[in-house]
Amino acid sequence: MKLSGVELRRVQMPLVAPFRTSFGTQSVRELLLLRAVTPAGEGWGECVTMAGPLYSSEYNDGAEHVLRHYLIPALLAAEDITAAKVTPLLAKFKGHRMAKGALEMAVLDAELRAHERSFAAELGSVRDSVPCGVSVGIMDTIPQLLDVVGGYLDEGYVRIKLKIEPGWDVEPVRAVRERFGDDVLLQVDANTAYTLGDAPQLARLDPFGLLLIEQPLEEEDVLGHAELARRIQTPICLDESIVSARAAADAIKLGAVQIVNIKPGRVGGYLEARRVHDVCAAHGIPVWCGGMIETGLGRAANVALASLPNFTLPGDTSASDRFYKTDITEPFVLSGGHLPVPTGPGLGVAPIPELLDEVTTAKVWIGS
């Protein structure tokens, strides 16, 4: 398959409500979308970078630059590409996993559409729907938090994740447990906001029966997570630290992780995400699919990934209306706490042209 070119779009999508984490507050999702064009058809990719280098060292302007000047030209120069060849073709360029993952996603979508095969079938799906959790941002007050959590439980979400930071950890967890009981599947996400010196404070979460605490320490501090695992009872889940299947294997060997959050963009694409899944399965480590406030394009691919056998915990694969009043694809709608796995060719969804145009702020064509 020869790549004819790639259209790169900048889009801005307003969120239904501001989303606050330990590294900042978002009210608009700014992201990059890629449309890969081949003689056999086209495919879509979504780059999960943010406007600034806060969650990750990658960010939108940097991703656009490396895509335009290095990654896309490298694929255009290749005589024959498949999704499996994207990573080797781009290996000489260091880092930029999110940008590489978006390009691989677009090529994979084009390839699978041409062969009338779905993402789910290609990745190894074993179910036709996936259970959905929801991520709840840091709130101004406990009553506000309880109202929001209650609303999501009423909608049918089967797991609640609370974002935490120093000063907003034990009390919100206690309040949710007291209001909604011990049967609610509950976990917390620190987004690297703590240090090993905070272990006594994090141990205060142990009595609440949490599923996990996600990425409490800096992403490079794998040994610190291993030590923290010895000091607290709540299982440690790694997110930012897991950038590849090798990183997952190393963290498992060091005893730094009991559960893994797989984010395809963070590991360089859906094919590497499947390898992370396989490594974890081989070591008896359960996984779940994280989210990056994706559009319906990324959501479709994530739901397909989450239908693999070792995804045994509900992920952040929320319905479209969790973040967006209007998505750029047909919306994903929660039913019985689950989302359906797309079965159409490729992603199984595509942007609705008029909706995509409404949120597009710039676009450029790279190719012949």
Swiss-Prot record:
Alphabetical UniProt keywords: Isomerase, Lyase, Magnesium, Metal-binding
Binding positions (2-succinylbenzoate): 135, 161-163, 191, 293
Impact when changing residue 163 to A/R/S: Significantly impairs both NAAAR and OSBS activities
Species for this entry: Amycolatopsis sp
Temperature optimum or stability note: Optimum temperature is 50 degrees Celsius. Stable at 55 degrees Celsius for 30 minutes.
Comment, domains: The active-site cavity can accommodate both the hydrophobic substrate for the OSBS reaction and the substrates for the racemase activity. Accommodation of the components of the N-acyl linkage appears to be the reason that this enzyme is capable of a racemization reaction on these substrates, whereas the orthologous OSBS from E.coli lacks this functionality.
Free-text remark on how the cofactor is bound: Binds 1 divalent metal cation per subunit. Enhanced by the addition of divalent metal ions such as Co(2+), Mn(2+) and Fe(2+).
UniProt EC number: 5.1.1.-, 4.2.1.113
GO molecular function, one term: metal ion binding
Cofactor(s) the record lists: a divalent metal cation
Catalytic activity: N-acetyl-D-methionine = N-acetyl-L-methionine; (1R,6R)-6-hydroxy-2-succinyl-cyclohexa-2,4-diene-1-carboxylate = 2-succinylbenzoate + H2O
Function comment: Acts as a N-succinylamino acid racemase (NSAR) that catalyzes the racemization of N-succinyl-phenylglycine and N-succinyl-methionine. Can catalyze the racemization of a broad range of N-acylamino acids, including N-acetyl-D/L-methionine, N-propionyl-D/L-methionine, N-butyryl-D/L-methionine and N-chloroacetyl-L-valine. Also converts 2-succinyl-6-hydroxy-2,4-cyclohexadiene-1-carboxylate (SHCHC) to 2-succinylbenzoate (OSB). Catalyzes both N-succinylamino acid racemization and OSB synthesis at equivalent rates. NSAR is probably the biological function of this enzyme.
Catalytic site: 163, 263
pH dependence, record text: Optimum pH is 7.5.
Reported impact of residue 291 to D: Shows up to 6-fold higher activity than the wild-type on a range of N-acetylated amino acids
Subunit structure: Homooctamer.
Effect of residue 323 to Y: Shows up to 6-fold higher activity than the wild-type on a range of N-acetylated amino acids
Annotated control of activity: Inhibited by EDTA and sulfhydryl reagents such as p-chloromercuribenzoic acid. Both OSBS and NAAAR activities are inhibited competitively by salicylhydroxamate.
Binding site for Mg(2+): 189, 214, 239
Biological process according to GO: menaquinone biosynthetic process
Family statement drawn from the similarity comment of this UniProt entry: Belongs to the mandelate racemase/muconate lactonizing enzyme family. MenC type 2 subfamily.
SMART domains: MR_MLE
Stated name of the protein: N-succinylamino acid racemase
InterPro entries reported in the protein's UniProt record: Enolase-like_C_sf, Enolase-like_N, Enolase_C-like, Mandelate_racemase_C, Mandelate_racemase_N_dom, OSBS/NAAAR
Technological use: Variants with increased racemase activity could be used on an industrial scale for the production of enantiomerically pure alpha-amino acids.
Keyword Cell membrane: no
